[in-house]
Regions:
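Structured secondary-structure scaffolds
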Residues: 1-189, 203-226
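NTP/phosphate- and nucleic-acid-binding module
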Residues: 190-194
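Gly/Thr-rich phosphate-binding loop signature of adenosyl cofactor/nucleotide-binding cores
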Residues: 198
Length: 227
C-alpha cells in the first residue's frame, strides 16, 4: 500500500526543510525493508517564486528628509520600503497616500523635481514586510479568474522564479475572448455537425498532442503558447 506519490511540488523552503525530513524517513524505512521504494515521489518539481517589484524611497539618515530618485545629495541616505500600491506605472509616488499610511511620513519633508517624487525599484521576494504583495482580486474583477490563471502559466517555466508584471495581461484576456468566440456567436453556442477539413483535423490533433506532452512535462507556459 505504501508506495511513491506521482508528483511532489514544493519551493526552495521545502527542499531544505520538509523534503529533507520526509526523504530521511523514507530512506530509513526503506533500509528496514518496511517500504518497497527508496524515494517516496516519482517526480519532484521545485517551483519558482513569483517575485515582487519593490518600491523604495531615500531617507537622509537621522532625519525626516526624503529625496526623489533623480535628486543626488551629498548626504548619507538609506532606502525605505514603501507600499507598491502608492506607486503608478511611471514610478511616481502618491505622497498624500504615503502620509496617511504611516505616522513617520505624516510630517516628513519630501524633495522632488517638478512635483514628481520618483521611487527606486528592485525585484525581490514577494513579502508583506517588503510591501510588494499584489492582491489578485482587482485582476479578477477586471479580467476574470481564468485570465489570471492563464497569465500565471504563461509567465515562464514552473521551476524558474519570475517577477510579477501585468503588462501583458490584456493580451491574455484578448486571447480568451477570441477562444470563446470560436464556440459562441452572437450570444449563442455555435457548434455544427459539418465534417471538418483535413487541415482542421491536422491542426486539432497536433495541438492536442502538444498540450498533452506539455502537461505531462509540466511545461505549462509552452502549452499555452501552442494556441
Amino acid at each position: 500500500y505504501w508506495k511513491e506519490v506521482d508528483v511532489y511540488i514544493g519551493g526552495s523552503e521545502h527542499a531544505t526543510g520538509h523534503l529533507l525530513y520526509s526523504r530521511f524517513w523514507q530512506y530509513f524505512l526503506y533500509d528496514l525493508d518496511l517500504v518497497p521504494v527508496k524515494d517516496y515521489a516519482k517526480k519532484l518539481i521545485n517551483q519558482g517564486m513569483i517575485l515582487g517589484n519593490s518600491a523604495f524611497i531615500s531617507r537622509e539618515v537621522g532625519t525626516d528628509n526624503y529625496f526623489s530618485k533623480e535628486i543626488v545629495k551629498n548626504v548619507k541616505t538609506q532606502l525605505i520600503h514603501v507600499d507598491v500600491q502608492f506607486v503608478n506605472t511611471n514610478n511616481e509616488l502618491d505622497l498624500d497616500a504615503l502620509r496617511n499610511w504611516q505616522p513617520q511620513f505624516k510630517n516628513a519633508h519630501f524633495e522632488s523635481l517638478n512635483n514628481k517624487f520618483i521611487v527606486h525599484r528592485e525585484v525581490e521576494k514577494m513579502s508583506k514586510s517588503k510591501y510588494n504583495v499584489i492582491n489578485p482580486d482587482q485582476i479578477c474583477n477586471d479580467y476574470g479568474a481564468d485570465t489570471l490563471r492563464l497569465y500565471e502559466m504563461f509567465l515562464g517555466p514552473i521551476e524558474q522564479a519570475k517577477p510579477w508584471n501585468t503588462a501583458g495581461i490584456s493580451g491574455t484576456y484578448s486571447f480568451l475572448k477570441k477562444f470563446w468566440n470560436l464556440f459562441h456567436s452572437t450570444g449563442k453556442f455555435y457548434v455544427d455537425d459539418n465534417n471538418p477539413s483535413k487541415e482542421s483535423l491536422k491542426i486539432l490533433h497536433k495541438t492536442i498532442k502538444k498540450i498533452e506532452e506539455d502537461i505531462n512535462d509540466f511545461s505549462l507556459n509552452t502549452s499555452v503558447s501552442a494556441f
